[in-house]
């Protein structure tokens, strides 16, 4: 051995206390690599290919942790009907199910982290996470997969948490991170502050009741905290309203639902805007009594797509081919 040293094995033995990460190109690579790891008494961490869902139970049996990519197959496009006939049904099935890879792995309780590795459009990362939530992966599972799990894989206890003494790596957001209206204000990396969007002085969003010209109206302020929008209604009729929030003031220009001619301007200090009696100024410069009363906090409106149940994927085929069955054949 002294004459024919294997430097690869020497390096492997020298650093075997460190996590050993191996990249795979398809699901069977995982099982082959796991067999090699068993022979070497080493548990690998597997960088997935996106096909792991096809054999999630076998992935679970490796006892390994996975790093799952978020780049999925693009839709197949062809203007030639003859070319369409040449498409592999297994490829079409993979296009359908690949975005559910992490969902299937979570159902089998396979530990995994999510990665931006191989993601062509890095800016789509947050959208990918939100889409996984729609597809059935819980918010807690998603957040763990980008915080706690990566830290556990690297065996670094000072990362992936907000415990005292840990590295200050976190983001500050306006709302639930998985809401479309959510705005990222700050990103802290190793204790260094990075301002992404200026945090508003006050989040004015919510439902209010307004009295003007001896009439009562409903005022709803919604949208993003950094760029709120408003609407004013009375029963089923809508008025028009322009809203601006700046310099610790909230300014509104209002056209009431039953009056398309008159304009009213209102200026409120953000130190006292929720419950206030003051004046509105009409287009002729007259002071009109005005009262605003806070009713409840902002609640995002769910669109029809959001109200729908979690997306349900099609069945996995065994084997994963055109004539596969929906149930894995049992041994006789």
Regions found by a protein language model. Give the residues of each.
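Histidine/acidic residue-rich metal-binding segments in metalloenzymes
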Residues: 1-45, 49-66, 96-109, 127, ...
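His/Asp/Glu-enriched, well-ordered alpha-helical/loop segment
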Residues: 19, 65-173
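Transmembrane beta-barrel architecture of outer membranes
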Residues: 54, 67-69, 98-102, 107, ...
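Short, charged, surface-exposed secondary-structure boundary motifs
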Residues: 55-58, 75-82, 183
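C-terminal cap of metal-dependent C-N hydrolases
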Residues: 167-200
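Tryptophan-anchored aromatic micro-motifs
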Residues: 199-220, 227-236, 275-287, 299-301, ...
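Central antiparallel beta-sheet cores of small beta-barrel/beta-sandwich binding domains
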Residues: 210-271
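Soluble extramembrane regions of membrane proteins in the secretory/endomembrane system
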Residues: 287-294
């Amino acid at each position: 051995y002294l004459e024919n040293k294997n430097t690869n094995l020497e390096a492997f033995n020298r650093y075997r206390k460190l996590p050993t990460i191996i990249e795979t190109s398809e699901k069977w690579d995982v099982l082959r690599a796991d067999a090699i790891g068993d022979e070497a008494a080493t548990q690998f961490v597997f960088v997935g290919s996106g096909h792991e869902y096809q054999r999630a139970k076998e992935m679970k049996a490796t006892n390994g942790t996975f790093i799952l990519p978020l780049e999925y197959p693009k839709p197949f496009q062809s203007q030639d009907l003859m070319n369409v006939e040449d498409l592999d049904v297994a490829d079409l099935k993979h296009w359908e199910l690949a975005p559910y890879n992490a969902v299937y792995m979570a159902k089998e309780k396979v530990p995994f982290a999510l990665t931006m590795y191989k993601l062509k459009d890095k800016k789509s990362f947050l959208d990918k996470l939100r889409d996984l939530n729609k597809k059935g992966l819980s918010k807690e599972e998603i957040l763990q997969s980008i915080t706690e799990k990566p830290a556990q894989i690297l065996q670094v206890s000072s990362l992936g948490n907000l415990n005292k003494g840990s590295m200050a790596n976190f983001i500050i957001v306006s709302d639930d991170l998985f809401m479309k209206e959510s705005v990222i204000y700050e990103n802290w990396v190793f204790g260094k502050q990075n301002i992404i969007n200026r945090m508003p002085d006050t989040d004015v969003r919510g439902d209010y009741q307004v009295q003007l010209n001896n009439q009562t109206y409903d005022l709803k302020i919604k949208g993003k905290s950094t760029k709120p929008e408003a609407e004013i209604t009375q029963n089923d009729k809508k008025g028009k309203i322009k809203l601006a929030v700046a310099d610790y003031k909230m300014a509104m220009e209002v056209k009431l639902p039953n009056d398309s001619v008159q304009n009213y301007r209102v200026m409120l200090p953000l130190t006292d805007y929720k419950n206030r009696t003051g004046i509105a100024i009409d287009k002729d410069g007259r002071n009109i009594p005005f009262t605003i009363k806070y009713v409840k906090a902002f609640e995002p409106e769910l669109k029809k797509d959001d109200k729908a149940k979690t997306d349900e994927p099609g069945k996995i085929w065994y084997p994963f081919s055109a004539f596969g069955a929906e149930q894995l054949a049992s041994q006789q």
